[in-house]
Swiss-Prot record:
Its EC number is 1.1.1.-. It comes from Homo sapiens (Human). Pathway: Steroid metabolism. Keywords: Disease variant, Endoplasmic reticulum, Lipid metabolism, Microsome, NAD, Oxidoreductase, Steroid metabolism. Inhibited by glycyrrhetinic acid (derived from liquorice). This is 11-beta-hydroxysteroid dehydrogenase type 2. Expressed in kidney, placenta, pancreas, prostate, ovary, small intestine and colon, and in lower levels in the spleen and testis. At midgestation, expressed at high levels in placenta and in fetal kidney and, at much lower levels, in fetal lung and testis. Catalyzes the conversion of biologically active 11beta-hydroxyglucocorticoids (11beta-hydroxysteroid) such as cortisol, to inactive 11-ketoglucocorticoids (11-oxosteroid) such as cortisone, in the presence of NAD(+). Functions as a dehydrogenase (oxidase), thereby decreasing the concentration of active glucocorticoids, thus protecting the nonselective mineralocorticoid receptor from occupation by glucocorticoids. Plays an important role in maintaining glucocorticoids balance during preimplantation and protects the fetus from excessive maternal corticosterone exposure. Interacts with ligand-free cytoplasmic NR3C2. Residues 396-405 have a biased composition (Pro residues). The keyword Lipid metabolism applies. Pfam families: adh_short (PF00106). It catalyses: an 11beta-hydroxysteroid + NAD(+) = an 11-oxosteroid + NADH + H(+); cortisol + NAD(+) = cortisone + NADH + H(+); corticosterone + NAD(+) = 11-dehydrocorticosterone + NADH + H(+); 11beta,17beta-dihydroxyandrost-4-ene-3-one + NAD(+) = 17beta-hydroxyandrost-4-ene-3,11-dione + NADH + H(+).
Amino acid sequence: MERWPWPSGGAWLLVAARALLQLLRSDLRLGRPLLAALALLAALDWLCQRLLPPPAALAVLAAAGWIALSRLARPQRLPVATRAVLITGCDSGFGKETAKKLDSMGFTVLATVLELNSPGAIELRTCCSPRLRLLQMDLTKPGDISRVLEFTKAHTTSTGLWGLVNNAGHNEVVADAELSPVATFRSCMEVNFFGALELTKGLLPLLRSSRGRIVTVGSPAGDMPYPCLGAYGTSKAAVALLMDTFSCELLPWGVKVSIIQPGCFKTESVRNVGQWEKRKQLLLANLPQELLQAYGKDYIEHLHGQFLHSLRLAMSDLTPVVDAITDALLAARPRRRYYPGQGLGLMYFIHYYLPEGLRRRFLQAFFISHCLPRALQPGQPGTTPPQDAAQDPNLSPGPSPAVAR
């Protein structure tokens, strides 16, 4: 009988020894991830036996097994104890659900809301413990930010401030960048970038003292050019770069910075169809006549319909995002980036590794597929469509007025 090659035997003994130690410490996640890791190691073993000399095969297998078991280790969590966390944008969505979870875990939660009598604020006041404090704050108003900073400093003297969750976000328009008013870009930057910047800088003395955490909710739209999200995506790209800068600069102070890049989720603001309809009508009412003539009302109606259709694929369970925020606050070694949601791995692979044309087609198929603006449609008087636009297979003819209505 053929003997088992010694590199395989030695490597599997090392893997088994480490797995046993992790099991004794209850530090190994069982289930399908473990089975998948073992299957991959077995396949790697087969390849190493045929392609590598025994010493190299032993080294590769042992290293792969060590890395796999490290990835399967249960994440070490810090105790909650009396830690205090400030969360912005708790009227609804991720902020509200995160505030509820952290309060149930024993955190002292300072939750900011736009309105103290909003439905989300009333829900938090009803279902959470007396430890949770609601604070009114509009990130576009420096006076509100100053008041929250003073309150936080005064009410965390005994516990210190462990974490800041920059969750509040803002988007007004889903349209081409040329169609989006400059005021929309400014308002997105005010909330998503400057508001987070001012609040973070104001709380850094407390966070440096506690060697705490900064968690910011970003968006994949800040990493890749989502169609019709120019204002929102630009602000999210800016805040992501800012947080990466903070991450490097605050490392000597022991402050860890994480960014959450969630997929498409059905938060209250996203699924409010009436709100998006009002914003579309406001955009049409204020659009310069020249742009309205060039693009056409049907074009904007088409974008709006595509956007609402894409929301049907959004996830209604916000738990993955809440869990990511919680892990960033309590993990002994939090990640720099979290990507909760479905399909993000494929999206980022396509964005980083495939040609630009394929990236553009994928984003249009996934989110919003453009039609031709009115001025580029065949038969329009006085207009000759550019050659590249006429030949672009991603652009479909504009919908007829009957379909748009």
